[in-house]
């Protein structure tokens, strides 16, 4: 919360009622008795159970153990930055890679990869059938492990389903044993929660300007190819049914649809209404702005990052200090793309040159052991985690298959090696009120990473985007500085560059922001940005087209009576209590002022529930009469282009009316949106043309990501 300038306070008596649940039996005194700890780490870890989590109902703490982390030495080059004098030295050395930092595994069939939270525990747990692997690769004598406290566990006999690692268990040293933690966990009503679960369907993603501005020598032809999908998407808004529905979130894959999104899937004729046409105009305008700011449609997906679980099991169960694993150096695995695909693995924030181009390894063996999730798996022999500056506690990578992007990325990564530098450890010590106050107040004033990120953008877009050795050094220094500030809340330390280094940095960062920040960050074009130059991102921004919106002419005519309960009466008189109260709230909804907080979902605001309840109570009419009257008034009398409040207050009632009223209508062609009368129950498309288009889409998807070969398929 410190990094987002937020502060959460709890009434003391309420906090004391749940303190032992949050702290799983520990107290400040018991922590101090064992030497204490860093005060800001304590506050951070105490808030784990206060984060937005869903309870994992079937989690059994008795089926869970914690083992040591797997580390692997990798010989590789790196550019070492000495924070005392900011000198940069390229060296080849053995680097210890924390291969399981923040990661654990579960063997329960059907388990979905998810980020978990529990008292003092956080990280990513991904599915891996370690029991099946044990039976296939290890004799029964190896089916035991030693936990971090020295206790032996028999995996099958003890019915172990979850194996967590020490790095996930933040306060492990304050418990004498795992049995003690489990006892407290049960006694104080603790539970495991998850805050992000791997989706069944992962949509195509968009790349961002940080990743693109690193590719400083991109040619105009390469830019044209890279923006082609985005330009086509912009041109298709309104005209192409599938594109329009996807951009508005009205798809079967959206599990959290708003009432309007659900209504559009049932009754696309709503596109004919002036309100939805205005939504489309704003959607297209936003799409153009985002594209000019670097958010381009790309053949890529955001995937959880997982280590190689086979290598971990070889180390954990077989005792191999240098396991082979299932992936070699330079290989990754994901079932979202096919074998042999060249993939650019990216991660945000993208500050230095974090393009890791790797080969996807898919065969019967990797599909069998890794195909149970949609993660991207990294090899234990690879320095990729140092390139991306990530760990495995829930970090996400944008994994892209695009020949143009990978070609340019490989060219720009020539001569680039990972950065390395020493960071201070978090200070320890006895916890008391003064230390807590000092830690929080210092962390709040210790600086923000936003200015550093913006400074890096200035450097990368200077000189028309042509990168010099000096610019690369400046970016390296700023990247180190950024990570010092990220850790400042824990370490309360950051270095300062020597004067001559500070002068070099200032030479680049004293300028205004790059011109494309007009679109990327809403900066003022007259006072806050430089004139456009020939940097990669400025050229991308200039090439994004802005065309007039065209509308699909295959969608049928809107019948507003489909939106009402036809068995209930209504009124459209402006002096009726229903219409009068609705119009009053149109002018007075500012009474609920939530500011500009981007975390608030406008379609689920408390204010709309209050307004809906007030209109019903004020009018003293049944809900269906209220909804019918407002629909009739806004769709026939006032014909408003702004029906946001109607749909936010009463949208789900309208959706239920649509479900009833459209039940006997002809089906909708999923390609063009036209209603058609099918010849038989097997006809799903209105024409041969739409059928062929759908077939081509299926073939393309199958080519990009063949199905996982498991079970009986492996025997064929």
Question: Language model features by range: what are they?
Answer:
Residues 1-389, 395-396, 402-674, 679, ...:
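Beta-strand-enriched accessory nucleic-acid recognition/scaffold domains that flank the catalytic cores
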Residues 676-677, 690, 694:
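Cys/His-rich microdomains that often coordinate metals
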